[in-house]
Structure formats: C-alpha cells, structure tokens
Amino acid sequence: MAYFENIDIKKLLEEDEDYSFPPFTEKDLEETEKAIGWKLPKSYIALLKIQNGGYINYEEFDECWLSAIYGISSSEGGLIDMFDNWINEWEYPNIGIPFGETQSAGHDMYFMDFSSVDENGEPRIVHIDNEADNSIDVVADNLEDFLI
C-alpha cells in the first residue's frame, strides 16, 4: 500500500535543528521500536523515510495545534527521547505513540492510538488533553487521514 500520495511531505515538514534528523537505518528503526515498546505503523515509517521529522509548515497544514513531527533518532528531540518524556515524565497514558510536538508545549498531545486500528493495522489518531485528566478525543482514523 502506498502512503501520502496526496500530500507533499517535503512541503508539509520543514527541516530544522530540533526535530529533523538524517535518514534512518533499519537498525535505527529496530532500536526505536525496542526502546518505546511499540512497532511503528507503516504509514509513519513511510512519512519519515521522506522526511525524518521536522516542523510543520503552516502554509500547508493550518488547522491544527501540531507544530512538529518526531523523527527516528536516539538524539534529543527524537522519538525515543520524546516518548520517554511524555509517557514517563508527563504521565500520558501508554496507549500508543506520541508522534509530534504541540503548540501547548506538552499540555496536550496527539497520539497514534493502538487501542483501535483500521483494516491495514494503522492506529487511529487521538488528541489527549493532559490538563483535563488525560481526556481522549478521536480526531482521525489513521495518520494519513489526519494529515490530509
């Protein structure tokens, strides 16, 4: 299955020093999945193969609080570091993978929620509000639908 055929990921994500990383290897992917305890969805891997993290270009994506997408890296700002921060320090529920930074600086997050997956095994996307007792709202059936 091809992902993101209707989205120009290179326009959506801007490279930067905080959230963009060099292309990842299969070993990097395996280490990330082992560290966070979740297998990354194929759509997220496909996105990160095009651009391994970065800030959101609001000219392309202007109706969301998402400000960056985490890349595969063990460095600061990478998925391993940020997963640990949100799950262990901020005590978000471990229902899946927090995949990007929000404009609220952590008071709410978007997660790939594995409690519900579509027919292709892709997790739904939820918004979790840390300030409202981690209330969960479904926002999209999968990552591609979320970014369209």
Give a label for each model feature.
Residues A105-M109, A132-V139:
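Short, surface-exposed beta-strand/loop "edge" segments at domain boundaries and coil↔beta transitions
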Residues H107-V117:
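Broad, structure-driven detector of short, well-ordered beta-strand segments within folded domains
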Residues M1-G106:
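A surface-exposed partner-binding patch
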Residues E101-Q103, S116, D129-A132:
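Short, flexible loop/turn elements at secondary-structure junctions
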Residues G96-I97, M109-Y110, P123-V126:
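A broad, low-specificity signal marking well-ordered, structured residues that form hydrophobic/aromatic
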